[in-house]
C-alpha cells in the first residue's frame, strides 16, 4: 500500500483539511511537515466543526499525529489548540501527538518582528503576523530555539542571549523595546514540562511505522503557489510547500512519501497581496465569495476569488510530481450559466502557458479564457460520479485534460462523507 502526500496546488485554502480528514480515516499516521499556525483549516465531522492551525488533522480521528521538524511551532498556540480541541471532546495525549524534538520554536519576539515589519513596509506581503517568517530566518541562521533545548535550561540561557543579540538591532531599527532574556527564559520554562511530554525523535517514530507497513499521510499546509522558491515571490510564505518538503520536513526518505495528491478548488482564491491573473471583481466573483464562504479561518480576511486557472495548476502538477488531484467546492459553481477556465496568459503581444518568475511579467499577465457551459442542477452532497449532471462531468473532464492529471477525489460539500472517490490514493 502507498503512503500519500497531500499538498495544496493553488494559493492555499483549497480544502486540504477536509480531504486530509477524509483520508486520515484510512491512514495510521498523519504528519505535518512544514509551515506553522499561519494556515488554518476547518473540519466538519458529524456536524461538529473543528478549527485547526497547527495540529495535524488526524487528531480528530484519533490517529497518531506527528508535527515534523519542518514545522515552526508556537508552543503557546500549540497548547491553546490542544486545550480547545480537548474542550470539544478530543483528548490530545502524548500517545496521540508527537512533536519533533528538533522542530524550531516561534517566540513572542518573532511575532513582534513580523508585525512591525509589515506595518513599516510600503510593499505589503500579506503576512498573518504570527511570526512564521522570522522564525524560519532564525532557523536558517542557526540561532533558533528548538524543542529539545527546553530540556536543558543551562544551555538554553546562552542560546537566548545569542538570539536576543541578533534581534536587538532589528527591534531598535523598528522602534520596538528591547526583549528581556529572563522573561523569555521564565516563560519557556513554565511551559517546558507540558511541551516536552509530546517531544520525541519524530523521524525515528515514522521510520518504525514505515517499516511496520503502517499507512502514513503527509499533510501539507498553504499551497504550491506560496512556496518560497516556486511561488509568486515575494508574495509567498517562508517555507517550501511543495511535495518534496514532505521528506525533509518529516525525516523520511523521498521514497516513503508515496502518492502525491494535489488539492484544487474548482475555482481560484487567494488571501493577501500578490499577482492573481484570473481574479474577478464582478457578480461572479461575489457569488464565489458568498456561496463558497471565502473567509480565512485564522485571520477572518476575505479571500480574493477568480475563475479556475489551469495554467497555475498545471505548473503545480509539474513542480510537485502530482499523481492525481482532489477537486473541491464543485458545488459552489452550481447556478452559474457560463463558466470560464484560464488556459493561458497574454503578456504584451505574446501568449504564454506558464506564469513567469518576474514580477513585471506577472503583473502584466492577462488571462486567456475558454468558456464552458455551466449548470443549474445542484451537485451539493453528491457521493457518486453518476449523481453529477452532464455539464458538471464535462467540467471535471476538461479540468483533467488541461492540468495533465486525473481527478482522484471530488468534494461536493464541507461534510466529510460528501466525497466521490474516483481513484484510491492509498492504492498508488
Curated annotation (Swiss-Prot):
- UniProt keyword terms in alphabetical order: Cytoplasm, GTP-binding, Ligase, Magnesium, Metal-binding, Nucleotide-binding, Purine biosynthesis
- Molecular function GO labels: adenylosuccinate synthase activity; GTP binding; magnesium ion binding
Q: Where in the cell is it found?
A: Cytoplasm
Query: Among its keywords, does the record have Hydrolase?
Result: no
What does the record list as coiled-coil region(s)?
none
One matching Pfam family is Adenylsucc_synt
Q: Which GO terms describe its cellular component?
A: cytoplasm
Which pathway does UniProt place it in? Purine metabolism; AMP biosynthesis via de novo pathway; AMP from IMP: step 1/2
Sites binding Mg(2+) sit at: 13, 40
Binding residue positions for GTP: 12-18, 40-42, 303, 329-331, 411-413
InterPro entries the record matches: Adenylosuccin_syn_GTP-bd, Adenylosuccin_syn_Lys_AS, Adenylosuccinate_synth_dom1, Adenylosuccinate_synth_dom2, Adenylosuccinate_synth_dom3, Adenylosuccinate_synthetase, P-loop_NTPase
EC number(s) from the headed UniProt entry: 6.3.4.4
The annotation note on the cofactor reads:
Binds 1 Mg(2+) ion per subunit.
What reaction does this catalyse? IMP + L-aspartate + GTP = N(6)-(1,2-dicarboxyethyl)-AMP + GDP + phosphate + 2 H(+)
Q: Which residues bind IMP?
A: 13-16, 38-41, 128, 142, 222, 237, 301
Enzyme class, top EC level, equals ligase
Question: Per the UniProt entry, what is one GO biological process?
Answer: 'de novo' AMP biosynthetic process
Nucleotide-binding in keyword set: yes
Oligomeric and partner information? Homodimer.
Q: Family, per the entry?
A: Belongs to the adenylosuccinate synthetase family.
PANTHER family according to UniProt: ADENYLOSUCCINATE SYNTHETASE (PTHR11846:SF0)
This protein is called Adenylosuccinate synthetase
Name of the encoding gene: purA
